[in-house]
Amino acid sequence: MTDRYILAVESSCDETSVAILKNESTLLSNVIASQVESHKRFGGVVPEVASRHHVEVITTCFEDALQEAGISASDLSAVAVTYGPGLVGALLVGLAAAKAFAWANHLPLIPVNHMAGHLMAAREQEPLVYPLIALLVSGGHTELVYVPEPGDYHIIGETRDDAVGEAYDKVGRVMGLTYPAGREIDQLAHKGQDTYHFPRAMITEDHLEFSFSGLKSAFINVHHNAKQKGDELILEDLCASFQAAVLDILLAKTKKALSRYPAKMLVVAGGVAANQGLRDRLAQEITHIEVVIPKLRLCGDNAGMIALAAAIEYDKQHFANMSLNAKPSLAFDQFPDSFVIN
């Protein structure tokens, strides 16, 4: 049997990444050019800065990924690319590069939803068992997804306002922590106690929706009022209280989803899946079903996860033509108009 190699491109936000996947789940390379240092002084991602950085490094990422994998363009079977959701300028850089490379090398083009990539990152460590439930937690999304079979995604719950990763970064900015703040908040939380008892929005309601704007506002008010009065703030307790509220909400909604859908596996993915507090709570509280979380290197944005999702689309011959465009607000159940089904 001839080996299959997929080159994947990810540029939806502030990471430029190109990866090579061999067959179903073997990542031969996963080159990531991070822009975190460039965005730190702004306290968040600046879209124009992100796009310019993608342009500067993407060609080098292609070269490095092929070299690290030990293959050439002639060995490839397809090119995959994130076409949404994300920052439109950033997406267009990756799309242009992927389409040009695919066209020049006479390779089929596979469009991949960025969030499907996060979900399928777990395929690298073990085969996924269907049907499954996925909790996707990142800087831009918080979603519960029911996946009855590979490539078939149904959103059953999502945030009504802030994504959980966004809330982490916003409260981190209030405390003067370095962007991105999630890791530092997690570390501080392990040293503190839940003394502030922040609200857990909609935690007892029957639906599977999330809300973090009220929690964020409550945190900011506590911090602001203490500063105004000159009261002492214990950062460890602030972080522990914030994280306890976040995790209570995530766990409560995930448990409800598992009780309502016939899942054989729970996948937790996205940048916030790197949070040690979340991993600990999942291990303690969800024991009746297998929980799969991608390795830390695959939790953030990377092309490896895009390649892993693309392998499923390749099997279905879900290719796109060269009119494929960026979809910054792409939904999970939305497919490109340019699909060419062979």
UniProtKB/Swiss-Prot annotation:
Matching PANTHER family: TRNA N6-ADENOSINE THREONYLCARBAMOYLTRANSFERASE, TRNA N6-ADENOSINE THREONYLCARBAMOYLTRANSFERASE, MITOCHONDRIAL
Family (UniProt): Belongs to the KAE1 / TsaD family.
DNA damage as UniProt keyword: no
Top-tier EC class: transferase
NCBIfam families xref list: gcp_kae1, T6A_TsaD_YgjD
Catalytic reaction(s) noted: L-threonylcarbamoyladenylate + adenosine(37) in tRNA = N(6)-L-threonylcarbamoyladenosine(37) in tRNA + AMP + H(+)
Residue numbers binding Fe cation: 114, 118, 301
GO cellular component: cytoplasm
GO molecular function: iron ion binding; N(6)-L-threonylcarbamoyladenine synthase activity
Cofactor note: Binds 1 Fe(2+) ion per subunit.
Primary role: Required for the formation of a threonylcarbamoyl group on adenosine at position 37 (t(6)A37) in tRNAs that read codons beginning with adenine. Is involved in the transfer of the threonylcarbamoyl moiety of threonylcarbamoyl-AMP (TC-AMP) to the N6 group of A37, together with TsaE and TsaB. TsaD likely plays a direct catalytic role in this reaction.
EC number: 2.3.1.234
One Pfam family, short name: TsaD
Primary gene name: tsaD
Record's subcellular location: Cytoplasm
Protein name: tRNA N6-adenosine threonylcarbamoyltransferase
Annotated residues for binding of substrate: 136-140, 169, 182, 186, 275
Keywords linked to the UniProt accession: Acyltransferase, Cytoplasm, Iron, Metal-binding, Transferase, tRNA processing
GO biological process, one term: tRNA threonylcarbamoyladenosine modification
Cofactor or coenzyme needed: Fe(2+)
